[in-house]
Amino acid sequence: DLLVQKFNRTVGQEKGVRVQVTNLSSASKIGGFLKEAQKGGRDAPEMPDLFTCHISDATALGSDNLVDWNARFTAEELSNFVPGFLADGMTEDGTLLLFPISKSTQLLMCNGSGFARFSQATGVSYADLSTWEGFYDAAGKFYDWSGGEAFCALDYPIRSVELNALEHGSGDFYTKNGWYDTNNVVFKESWMQFARSLAQGHVVVSDLYSNTQVMTGDVLSSLGSSAAILYYNDTVTYRDGTQEPMDLHVLPMPKTAGADALMAQAGVGLCAYKTTDQKAEAAALFVRWLTESERNLDFVAQTGYMPVRNGAFDAIENYDKFPEPTESYRQLYAALKIMQESYTPLSEPRFEGYYGKVSQLYD
């Protein structure tokens, strides 16, 4: 809302454009709100001109009813954005319905104090965690060394399984009804690698948020959203009440050795409802302003999200406005920059009902 106010006082005032926030909704509920507004009726909310949503919400409204950002931005302008982030907001025919403003991904966060003791005793290093093979091997060694404690809590294990399988060359492993083909040999082996580690107690599925389990010393590390950085403390408080510095270490998502690395991406984008050409141009003006490199980095750096412009990524190395604890944020964005440079972003599955099935799987 502060950014909207700043836009209205500056560029908006200069160009005769005013953005007004009319409704606030969670990402999980915005789709239903938009469909209700589109349907209309006496008690229906007013359809907003500009809104954030997921691509599945956008396509449900109908591509013909939405602004194609390709028509509002030149090819040269779009070339300045991370290609995979743009692709995440496109339909199959290339229509750009959702303009990216920020993206989160998954990576590894470790209790550095605890890892130092583990490393000294076993020789396992942070470098060993760069591959899935090394990650699962380290998890087994930690279990043995610690006397039966889990090494890592995973927030979205099925996504990790997917990335590992695709990096191993699984190809398409989705069925027509929007689930996983267990007859796909490569996908099945990726799943079994995780399942074996889970059954042996080397890793666990998180109790909602893996960062909590790291901060209480229940696990040594977490594999979850980059946005979890917001919730990490400077100290680890163990179950017996003892404390020590967290010394948080943030590492890129493990990848398959010798393969092209993939990374998850999540986050809503900006979508404009098609009404008048004047409103579409005003929406594009706001999106340009919001995604300018420096402003985009300032916007995301407080939350653990990734900027969407290549130029914003380039500025991370010398960025000096991270919140406290500064070193944790610095490590996070150094890891994100590595991933932006050498990993390919992968969109989440778009099957209807997919997320409900995933929730049932975790339960």
Residues of each region from the PLM?
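Short, solvent-exposed loop/beta-turn-alpha elements that line the ligand-binding surface or hinge
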Residues: 70-81, 124-128, 152, 171-189, ...
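Short amphipathic alpha-helical coupling segments at ligand-binding clamshell hinges
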Residues: 3, 189-193, 278-290, 357
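Glycine-centered hinge/linker elements that transmit conformational signals in sensory
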Residues: 136-140, 176-208, 248, 253
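C-terminal capping/gating helix-and-loop segments adjacent to ligand/active sites or protein-protein/ligand interfaces
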Residues: 264, 326-363
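Extracytoplasmic/periplasmic substrate-recognition and gating elements
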Residues: 199-202, 239-311
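Extracytoplasmic/periplasmic solute-binding protein
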Residues: 95-101, 106, 133-180, 219-221
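Conserved N-terminal structural module of periplasmic/extracytoplasmic solute-binding proteins
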Residues: 1-58
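Hinge/lid segment of periplasmic solute-binding proteins
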Residues: 52-107, 136, 245-254
